[in-house]
Every structure is written in C-alpha cells, then in structure tokens.
C-alpha cells in the first residue's frame, strides 16, 4: 500500500523551490519543531529560520533552508511561504561559518544597542540553521 501524501509548495519571493507530493514535512515553527503529514488539521503559523525537511513519495528526503516565513496547512495542500529559501545542496558552508563567527563576535563585544544584539542573534540563528542542513546532507 502506498503512503498517504499531501501536496507541498515551498516558495520564496525569488522562486518556487519545490512543488509536489510528499509523505511528511518538518519545519521550525514559532513554538518549536513541527511535523505535518497527510490529514493534518488546518494550521497557520510563523516559521523561524531553519530547515524544511521533506520526505517525498517513496522515502526520498530533501532539505531546504528558510530564513523565516509562514506555514499554511490545508486539507490537501501545505504551503511554505519563505522570506528567503535555498536548497540544502546550494548552501555555502564557508559563508555560513563566517556569518556565525561574525554574529558571535558582535554578540560577545556587547553590542551598543539592543537592536544590534537582536540583529546579531538573528544572524547567528540563520547561520546555525544553514550549518545544520549541511551536516544533515553529509549524513545522507
């Protein structure tokens, strides 16, 4: 028997990164990790910078980095509207490492304004999310 699937669209302002049937989706919502399978209750939630892990039909996995956005779950359609989205294999590890170091340095020197600190914290979260995806791809 075939696994139950749902249609998923992952889009950003720049492009559509994925459109097709998936068995499951995992994202980082505003309240923590969230998994969506076929038959999930309708939902609308904010997404934090992180990984979209999707399991396509027949078990193939794909990883996409998003820098925040919105998740909408309808009975037969799941949509990820990302602020920015990049396929996992297109991420630049050296750039992510450099961004992580810069954000940590900015936070360590006690940013002069709270806004600077918050911006550095967001940059750090984005860099860590990118590095997590790169590590996941290495495990495959």
Curated annotation (Swiss-Prot):
GO terms for molecular function: ATP binding; proton-transporting ATP synthase activity, rotational mechanism. InterPro entries: ATP_F1_dsu/esu_C_sf (IPR036794), ATP_synth_F1_dsu/esu (IPR001469), ATP_synth_F1_dsu/esu_N (IPR020546), ATP_synth_F1_esu_C (IPR020547), ATPsynth_dsu/esu_N (IPR036771). Keywords: ATP synthesis, Cell inner membrane, Cell membrane, CF(1), Hydrogen ion transport, Ion transport, Membrane, Transport. The keyword Hydrolase does not apply. Pfam families: ATP-synt_DE, ATP-synt_DE_N. Gene3D superfamilies: ATP synthase delta/epsilon subunit, C-terminal domain, F0F1 ATP synthase delta/epsilon subunit, N-terminal. It is a peripheral membrane protein. The keyword ATP-binding does not apply. It is found in: Cell inner membrane. Produces ATP from ADP in the presence of a proton gradient across the membrane. Belongs to the ATPase epsilon chain family. F-type ATPases have 2 components, CF(1) - the catalytic core - and CF(0) - the membrane proton channel. CF(1) has five subunits: alpha(3), beta(3), gamma(1), delta(1), epsilon(1). CF(0) has three main subunits: a, b and c. This is ATP synthase epsilon chain. It comes from Pseudoalteromonas translucida (strain TAC 125). The gene is atpC.
